[in-house]
Amino acid sequence: MTSEVLLATNNAKKLTELRRIIVEYDMDIQVLSLKDIASYPEPEETEWTFEGNALIKARQGMIHSGLPALADDSGLCVDALGHMPGVRSSRWDGPEQEDIANMELVLRQIEDVPRGRRQAQFVSVMALVMPDGREFTTRGEMTGHLTTRPKGA
């Protein structure tokens, strides 16, 4: 019997990636997206942790779908900026800004920081909320150094 899970995101790339992983590992799971849920109200990310914001989104998804719901929150934590922008990464240059504007602002803010002191971590947290009330989170971090200009996708 195929199980269903909701991926509580509007990001088509995340949906494609999760579906690819499910096929790769031969799991009998159908992944639904927010487009499959009628009148889904986008929750505000009001927490100060990645875990808290991922849980807000997963809880909202589970409540509106009745299905197990997965959601994530992620961002960049720059040592020289006191680990900011952190949970505010997608809004660092203001609400509704594109990723490039947020990246450019971070780079302007650290332009006087020497190359050897541009440490940063990309943090991603995935939350799963089950209809029976159980909640799970997992966290991944990638540490590195910021360059002087945006590169990659």
Model-inferred region functions:
Residues 2-6, 12-32, 36-153:
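Anionic-ligand binding patches
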